[in-house]
């Protein structure tokens, strides 16, 4: 009877252990699903939005929420791992080997440990990306964070993080083999090691590299039409730490977004083309750093719109985007509305092939316009005072029916980063002023130049120029004090020969004490109708002369 009772208890225990193993198995299945949702959906989405931020997209980071989910997962996984290990220990202690149980527990232990490993390695992330266009010998910053560091007590022995720069081919090899040759790198980075610190208030384990500097870069061999600005690198962040009193050791690494390395400022526009194309069209889970060679115009338009809005403060209109499509596809105005939407734009058309009869590409033209607007025209652009994206012929057609003195502003087709003023003269004739560039606006702003030119009366269609640009005029005081060194400061005023004297010479304007008719030929200078640079622009302020006014 005693033996029978013992056998019944043993059978009951075996059944309970089988039930426990089944429940643990179900728990791991649920954890797997949940972890996949957090890592493969939420964290991947966060990374994608972080990449689009590089193109100017608004980034509402929910990383703190993702950390909370990851910490909860880490806690549940760790507790279940302890349960499995305890069940294994009891099995060995009792010495019972019921059929079917002996193999389940080690297998479950492997599964739960793999889940933990995946969670830890996936949550070692770059919170603040390094600059994607990186100039050698220029300081830059970056921050990495371990989302589950606090929960797993990793900070008890703070891990070291090392940063190296690797090529596209090396990044490929790393993802395939999960390892790289020791010490292999594509350049030298100063101040490239740091210790992760735990911040009690935020419960974040992170390290900020504030003073890194790329000293040297090794380039790959170029093929065909490739340039150094097409070549992509990545910063590799590596660390190692243990959890559970050294029971588990994790080697973690993560790659930054693609980086283009330049040595000179004139390489910046093309480098940004590479980065913009990659950020916009990179697909999840791609081979580093593969991007499509052709993309639908609608996607390109979205990327350009996002970029322009971030730089200048205002989105492009449908008309603006149609103009850009026409320019990118070298359409010359023949295409009808909407024809471009399904067309595919190639990387070569985007930033390799020069525009017709020009020595610059579509991207170089767009980038120069965006830079000019950001640095010198932001206010009027946001107000809608700059039409900008309109062809010379269209501008002439619009103005041909307007009154004398009506003007509009358009970006030059022929000069990089140039904006020209088109206006109506006598007998409805339309004139174009030679384009102003950043160099001109560094001397005198657009609004002040428009104020100087008395023959400009109303912004198209009929907005008085004071209403459109008045708030951007530089305040003027008649009695200018002498500077600290005793000199009287001169004032530079824009004047178009043949179109009236400088402001004030007609009895009004912003600068009433400007001398009368210092330089006034009898007829308009024929070069004002051109929209091309001239030799004169190298020695004078565009085609307009600058009248120096001494305020005495």
Describe these PLM feature segments.
Residues 1-107, 111-114, 129, 153, ...:
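Eukaryotic phosphotyrosine signaling hubs
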Residues 121-123, 127-167, 234:
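Contiguous beta-strand segments within globular domains
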């Amino acid at each position: 009877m005693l033996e029978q009772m013992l056998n019944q208890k043993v059978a009951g225990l075996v059944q309970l252990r089988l039930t426990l193993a089944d429940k643990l198995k179900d728990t791991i299945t649920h954890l797997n699903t949940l972890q996949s949702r957090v890592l493969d959906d939420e964290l991947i989405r966060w990374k994608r939005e972080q990449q689009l931020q590089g193109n100017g997209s608004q980034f509402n980071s929910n990383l703190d929420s993702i950390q909370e989910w990851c910490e909860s997962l880490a806690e549940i996984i760790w507790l279940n791992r302890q349960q499995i290990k305890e069940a294994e220990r009891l099995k060995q202690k009792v010495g019972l080997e019921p059929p079917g149980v002996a193999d389940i527990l080690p297998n479950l232990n492997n599964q739960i440990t793999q889940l933990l490993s995946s969670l830890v390695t996936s949550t070692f992330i770059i919170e603040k990306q390094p600059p994607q266009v990186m100039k050698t010998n220029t300081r830059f910053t970056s921050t990495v964070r371990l989302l589950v560091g606090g929960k797993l007590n990793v900070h008890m022995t703070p891990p070291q993080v090392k940063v190296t720069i690797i090529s596209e081919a090396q990044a490929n090899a790393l993802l395939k083999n999960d390892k790289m040759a020791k010490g292999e790198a594509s350049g030298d980075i100063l101040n490239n090691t740091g210790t992760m610190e735990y911040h009690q208030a935020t419960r974040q384990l992170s390290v900020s590299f504030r003073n890194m500097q790329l000293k040297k870069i090794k380039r790959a061999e170029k093929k065909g039409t490739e340039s150094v600005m097409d070549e992509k690198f990545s910063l590799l962040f590596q660390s190692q730490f243990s959890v559970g009193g050294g029971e588990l050791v994790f080697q973690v690494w993560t790659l930054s977004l693609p980086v283009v390395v330049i040595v000179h400022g004139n390489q910046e526009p093309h480098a940004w083309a590479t980065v913009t194309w990659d950020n916009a069209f990179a697909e999840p889970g791609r081979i580093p750093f593969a991007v499509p060679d052709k993309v639908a115009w609608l996607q390109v338009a979205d990327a350009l719109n996002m970029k322009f809005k971030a730089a200048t403060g205002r989105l492009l209109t449908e008309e603006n985007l149609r103009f850009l499509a026409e320019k990118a596809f070298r359409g010359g105005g023949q295409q009808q509305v909407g024809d471009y939407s399904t067309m595919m734009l190639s990387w070569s058309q985007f930033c390799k092939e020069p525009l017709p009869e020009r020595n610059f590409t579509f991207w170089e033209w767009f980038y120069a316009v965006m830079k000019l607007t950001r640095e010198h025209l932001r206010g009027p652009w946001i107000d809608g005072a700059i039409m900008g994206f309109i062809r010379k012929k269209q501008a002439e057609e619009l103005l041909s029916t307007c009154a004398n003195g009506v003007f509009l502003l358009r970006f030059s087709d022929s000069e990089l980063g140039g904006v020209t003023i088109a206006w109506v003269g006598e007998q409805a004739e339309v004139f174009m002023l030679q384009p102003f560039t950043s160099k001109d606006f560094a001397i005198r702003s657009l609004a002040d130049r428009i104020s100087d030119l008395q023959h400009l009366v109303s912004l198209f269609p009929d907005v008085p120029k004071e209403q459109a640009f008045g708030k951007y005029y530089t305040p003027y005081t008649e009695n200018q004090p002498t500077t600290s060194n005793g000199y009287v400061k001169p004032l530079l005023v824009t004047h178009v020969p043949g179109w009236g004297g400088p402001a004030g010479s007609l009895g009004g304007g912003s600068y009433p004490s400007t001398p009368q008719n210092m330089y006034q030929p009898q007829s308009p200078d024929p070069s004002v109708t051109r929209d091309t640079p001239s030799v004169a622009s190298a020695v004078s302020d565009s085609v307009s002369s600058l009248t120096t006014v001494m305020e005495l």
